[in-house]
């Protein structure tokens, strides 16, 4: 957040439009594949705005959540102030228990540097399941290393130990100058990243019925703890 304190009044509206649009295409593709319904928790939150905050001004945002038989939790949301540098834009897909394909998380942010996060959230402990690592993470390793080697981008390391523990070996969490070239780079990276995920869904083996309850407990715990420990979780609490 040191970047934000140094540049608190940058208009990031154009970046919001592009990043929200990139995520919208992903969310619409998920909605086209799975039968999901809007969750009551997002009623009245398609667009919201706060009272004036002494530091961040008026915060605004949108919260859109969906659920279905094959998707436990699908969220497309953002919060921030487009005239005061800060944005947190999220697209998250927590799958149901019909298989063990990793969940999907794509985040854009502005601080006001561009922040980018792309992750296949594991469905089990990777330390004790090397076959799962080989199946879902080893094929992504080269792309991850190439992204990390890009001199325009700097690896973003969370101050929170729990959040760092959530990251898989191929999790992209990086920041760069806020410009169209770097947003283009993220968009290009996501084309392959998202298509690979959908290919996994097409090829996935069904998880036996008797293992699904335990998988659901694991998935829910990861989701809840991830949200509660998220760095930006404090922002709406402070403002609202």
Stretches found by the model and what they are:
Residues 1-6, 216, 240:
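Polar low-complexity intrinsically disordered regions
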Residues 117-231:
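Mixed-charge (acidic/basic) macromolecular-recognition segments
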Residues 11, 15, 29, 42-43, ...:
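Alpha-helical structural elements
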Residues 30-38, 67, 79, 99, ...:
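Generic secondary-structure transition motif, activating predominantly at the C-termini of alpha-helices
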Residues 70, 74-143:
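Extended, charge-biased low-complexity segments
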Residues 233-240:
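Extended amphipathic alpha-helical scaffold segments
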Residues 2-96:
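Short Lys/Arg-enriched alpha/beta "domain-start" segment
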């Amino acid at each position: 957040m040191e970047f934000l304190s140094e540049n608190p009044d940058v208009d990031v509206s154009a970046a919001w439009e592009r990043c929200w649009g990139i995520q919208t295409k992903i969310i619409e593709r998920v909605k086209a594949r799975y039968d999901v319904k809007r969750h009551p928790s997002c009623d009245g939150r398609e667009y919201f705005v706060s009272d004036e905050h002494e530091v961040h001004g008026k915060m605004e945002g949108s919260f859109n959540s969906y659920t279905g038989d094959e998707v436990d939790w699908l969220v497309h949301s953002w919060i921030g102030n487009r005239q005061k540098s800060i944005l947190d834009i999220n697209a998250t897909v927590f799958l149901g228990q019909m298989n063990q394909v990793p969940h999907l998380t794509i985040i854009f942010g502005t601080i006001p540097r561009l922040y980018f996060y792309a992750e296949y959230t594991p469905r089990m402990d990777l330390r004790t399941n090397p076959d799962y690592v080989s199946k879902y993470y080893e094929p992504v390793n080269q792309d991850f290393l190439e992204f990390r080697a890009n001199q325009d981008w700097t690896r973003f390391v969370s101050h929170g130990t729990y959040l760092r523990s959530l990251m898989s070996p191929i999790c992209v969490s990086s920041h760069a100058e806020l410009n169209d070239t770097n947003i283009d780079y993220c968009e290009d990276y996501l084309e392959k990243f998202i298509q690979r995920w959908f290919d996994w869904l097409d090829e996935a083996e069904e998880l036996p019925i008797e293992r699904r309850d335990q998988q659901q407990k694991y998935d829910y715990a990861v989701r809840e703890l991830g949200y509660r420990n998220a760095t930006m979780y404090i922002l709406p609490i402070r403002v609202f």
